[in-house]
Amino acid sequence: MDKDLKKVVVLLAPPNMKNSKANKALFDAIKEMDDVAIFNLYEMPDENILNMDAWSRIISHANAVIYQFPFYWMSAPSLLKKWQDEIFTYLAKTPAVAGKPLLVATTTGSEFDAYRSGGRNRFTVDELLRPYQCGAVHAGMIWQTPFVVYGMGTCLLYTSDAADER
């Protein structure tokens, strides 16, 4: 994992990346960028996911941290939550994360209008992400406005093959 000492650390956490269109597109947009290290938690060996020493070095070296995940039941998938509980909880008490930006990049199945007062989900995504913001602030990080892609469960995604058939 130390070979990935980069300036931006992306914790990628879609449980089913193979079938993900939106998270795969976000991944494809950044995977070749210099100084970006992407760690797909669902493809890492178990012993690396919770390796405190390795994560401490990686995060200490980074200038920014990004959590990228599909929004599952108003939260992150379980493996990112486990990483937060076991790694971030420790790092939050050290200088490793202090002063660094934390960005959440997430995709939702529901459309934008579902995430508002009176909408199907009753709250905005910003409101639902408040625990992440609270954790960042508590750790001395700089909370960034979340990057949210809405409506992945409700939109039609066209491929070049589909366009050729029309």
Residue ranges and their predicted role:
Residues 2-34:
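N-terminal beta1-alpha1 ligand-phosphate binding loop
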Residues 13, 41, 107:
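Cofactor-binding loop segments of dinucleotide-utilizing enzymes, especially the Rossmann-like FAD-
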Residues 35-47:
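A short beta-strand-loop structural module common to alpha/beta enzyme folds
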Residues 46-53, 156-157:
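Structural motif
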Residues 53-133, 139:
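Helix-loop-strand module that forms the ligand-binding subsite of alpha/beta enzymes
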Residues 148-154:
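Active-site rim beta-loop-alpha module in soluble metabolic enzymes
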Residues 158-166:
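Conserved small/polar residues in nucleotide/adenosyl-binding loops
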